[in-house]
C-alpha cells in the first residue's frame, strides 16, 4: 500500500507539473504581462452625451498612456483587417491582416525564422510594403519553398515578405492565432 500510495503521489505531481509547464508555454504564445484594449462605445450617458457614443483610440492616446502609467513599458497599436485576399501565384487565402509597429513582435512573441527579419523603424519611416507571414499562412501560400524576398498580393497591392514567424504554441487569441496572420 505504501508503494502504491507513493507512486500515485509521484504520478499526480508529475502530471501537475507537466500541465503547468505546457500551460505556461501556450500562454507565452500570446505574450507575457500584456493588456489588450479595444475601441467600443459608451454604456452610460455623460455630460449631455447619450449612450452608444463611439470610443476610439489614437496614437496620441498610446503616447499619453506610456508617459503617464509608469508600469507600462511598451505599447503597440494594432490595426486588423479581415476578408482581404492574399495571393501568391495560384494560391489564395484570406487571413487576418494586422498593421503593427516594430515593438509588437517583442510584446507578442512573434519571432521570425533565421532567414528573415521583423519589421523595423526604417520600414515604417519609408512606408515600405513589407509583410511577416504566420507559419501556416506561409505553408499555404508557398508550401516548403522559401517565402522571404517573394512578393505577395494583399488585395491588389504588392508586399515583400521579409520574414516568416517561427512555429509557436498559442491556445488563445483575440481575433486569430498568429500562425494564421500576416
Predicted feature locations:
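Hydrophobic, regular-secondary-structure patches
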Residues: 17-96, 103-107, 121-122, 139-140
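Residues at or immediately flanking beta-strands
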Residues: 1-3, 10, 34-36, 74-76, ...
